[in-house]
Amino acid sequence: MSSSTHHWIARRGTALQGSLAIPGDKSVSHRAVMFAALADGVSQIDGFLEGEDTRSTAAIFAKLGVRIETPSASQRIVHGVGVDGLQPPTEALDCGNAGTGMRLLAGLLAAQRFDSVLVGDESLSKRPMRRVTGPLAQMGARIETQDDGTPPLHVHGGQALHGIDFVSPVASAQVKSAVLLAGLYAQGETSVTEPHPTRDYTERMLSAFGVEIDFSPGKARLRGGQRLRATDIAVPADFSSAAFFIVAASIVPGSEVVLRAVGLNPRRTGLLAALRLMGAEISEENHAEHGGEPVADLRVRYAPLRGAQIPEALVPDMIDEFPALFVAAAAASGQTVVTGAAELRVKESDRLAAMATGLRTLGVQVDETPDGATIHGGSIGSGVIESHGDHRIAMAFAIAGQLSTGQVQVNDVANVATSFPGFDTLAQGAGFGLETAGRR
């Protein structure tokens, strides 16, 4: 059965309750496998996200000659080969749906002595890659894209890279990370300056693997020729996955949930600030640090939300959470205004258009703009939603269904497994009204 017939029926359930274990952070899982593969020695990764995207990244490193053991679904033991130990692949390297994987690998593979080809699924094959290949070319890399700048990426090895001081025109952690990874192999120093600070997972984790790197919000610098030391990584729960339960508990009356050991990277948690601005009741407990990443338990209680102007300064820190925020805005009283979010148009789908269209289908008034939208809160009706194969759109409308006056059918939800395997089971256990139909 094709993924297009795999859908959810979402309707009002009960108040959400319980202490929930959210799967591991996707961004941290990608990087943990990559850096452990490049390290000298053996690294153990606990809390690894067993999703399609991260499995694709692990499979790519296996094709590059790295031995990776899987003692359990959430564990990986990586036998690092060192920065100069990767082997030429015998076939194209399939990144699946993972934009993070493809863009970071472009920076890494540009510095190798062998040629390689990076391919992806239908969605990834439409995403812009010149934002990465451009600065890598400035460093001496040779990477070919399609004529429109999309994958596949043909990476020509054997190039001598040199460090650059790159002033990025886009606020993108993936672009920054690709340049920094190439910089590990480059002659001299490489620096990246961003228009707005982005997530610093790469910088924090490189430091955890023993790389000397200077970084502060919006800036990072390292010198080439360094080696990585194996280290064990405990991956925190993925904040972007937790976001759907944060919003659901905030809008479903009577709800109270605890989300355990959630990653709270300060460049990732703009949604918390936005929801608190709207009146959400979210507290942080049991602060700790895992692999350089701050974590805490999040306690979320239902609270009536009110519309707000979302500060543009928060946008880069919540770029993956906007589908969830749009549902919170639909449930709030008054208007919520989002600006400065044009980046949403080049994610796994055009998320601005997909969310605006979907909410209108459910009777919510949404005024779309080139870089955002105004959402008029009110009643959420029933209807059939097309997720466009986008995992975050699908999960957002599963939440919307919890306040529906009828039911919401969400089509094409198989891709949820890329970031949140078991979402439907966890949601049902917490109190969601959610049925899965037409499994593949």
UniProtKB/Swiss-Prot annotation:
<feature type="binding site">
    <location>
        <position position="99"/>
    </location>
    <ligand>
        <name>phosphoenolpyruvate</name>
    </ligand>
</feature>
<feature type="binding site">
    <location>
        <position position="26"/>
    </location>
    <ligand>
        <name>phosphoenolpyruvate</name>
    </ligand>
</feature>
<feature type="binding site">
    <location>
        <position position="27"/>
    </location>
    <ligand>
        <name>3-phosphoshikimate</name>
    </ligand>
</feature>
<dbReference type="InterPro" id="IPR013792">
    <property type="entry name" value="RNA3'P_cycl/enolpyr_Trfase_a/b"/>
</dbReference>
<feature type="binding site">
    <location>
        <position position="31"/>
    </location>
    <ligand>
        <name>3-phosphoshikimate</name>
    </ligand>
</feature>
<feature type="binding site">
    <location>
        <position position="320"/>
    </location>
    <ligand>
        <name>3-phosphoshikimate</name>
    </ligand>
</feature>
<dbReference type="InterPro" id="IPR023193">
    <property type="entry name" value="EPSP_synthase_CS"/>
</dbReference>
<feature type="binding site">
    <location>
        <position position="174"/>
    </location>
    <ligand>
        <name>3-phosphoshikimate</name>
    </ligand>
</feature>
<feature type="active site" description="Proton acceptor">
    <location>
        <position position="320"/>
    </location>
</feature>
<keyword id="KW-0057">Aromatic amino acid biosynthesis</keyword>
<feature type="binding site">
    <location>
        <position position="127"/>
    </location>
    <ligand>
        <name>phosphoenolpyruvate</name>
    </ligand>
</feature>
<feature type="binding site">
    <location>
        <position position="174"/>
    </location>
    <ligand>
        <name>phosphoenolpyruvate</name>
    </ligand>
</feature>
<feature type="binding site">
    <location>
        <position position="26"/>
    </location>
    <ligand>
        <name>3-phosphoshikimate</name>
    </ligand>
</feature>
<comment type="pathway">
    <text>Metabolic intermediate biosynthesis; chorismate biosynthesis; chorismate from D-erythrose 4-phosphate and phosphoenolpyruvate: step 6/7.</text>
</comment>
<feature type="binding site">
    <location>
        <position position="347"/>
    </location>
    <ligand>
        <name>3-phosphoshikimate</name>
    </ligand>
</feature>
<keyword id="KW-0963">Cytoplasm</keyword>
<dbReference type="GO" id="GO:0003866">
    <property type="term" value="F:3-phosphoshikimate 1-carboxyvinyltransferase activity"/>
</dbReference>
<keyword id="KW-0808">Transferase</keyword>
<dbReference type="InterPro" id="IPR006264">
    <property type="entry name" value="EPSP_synthase"/>
</dbReference>
<dbReference type="InterPro" id="IPR001986">
    <property type="entry name" value="Enolpyruvate_Tfrase_dom"/>
</dbReference>
<dbReference type="GO" id="GO:0009073">
    <property type="term" value="P:aromatic amino acid family biosynthetic process"/>
</dbReference>
<dbReference type="Pfam" id="PF00275">
    <property type="entry name" value="EPSP_synthase"/>
</dbReference>
<dbReference type="InterPro" id="IPR036968">
    <property type="entry name" value="Enolpyruvate_Tfrase_sf"/>
</dbReference>
<comment type="function">
    <text>Catalyzes the transfer of the enolpyruvyl moiety of phosphoenolpyruvate (PEP) to the 5-hydroxyl of shikimate-3-phosphate (S3P) to produce enolpyruvyl shikimate-3-phosphate and inorganic phosphate.</text>
</comment>
<dbReference type="GO" id="GO:0005737">
    <property type="term" value="C:cytoplasm"/>
</dbReference>
<keyword id="KW-0028">Amino-acid biosynthesis</keyword>
<dbReference type="GO" id="GO:0009423">
    <property type="term" value="P:chorismate biosynthetic process"/>
</dbReference>
<feature type="binding site">
    <location>
        <position position="392"/>
    </location>
    <ligand>
        <name>phosphoenolpyruvate</name>
    </ligand>
</feature>
<feature type="binding site">
    <location>
        <position position="172"/>
    </location>
    <ligand>
        <name>3-phosphoshikimate</name>
    </ligand>
</feature>
<dbReference type="GO" id="GO:0008652">
    <property type="term" value="P:amino acid biosynthetic process"/>
</dbReference>
<protein>
    <recommendedName>
        <fullName>3-phosphoshikimate 1-carboxyvinyltransferase</fullName>
        <ecNumber>2.5.1.19</ecNumber>
    </recommendedName>
</protein>
<feature type="binding site">
    <location>
        <position position="351"/>
    </location>
    <ligand>
        <name>phosphoenolpyruvate</name>
    </ligand>
</feature>
<comment type="subunit">
    <text>Monomer.</text>
</comment>
<comment type="similarity">
    <text>Belongs to the EPSP synthase family.</text>
</comment>
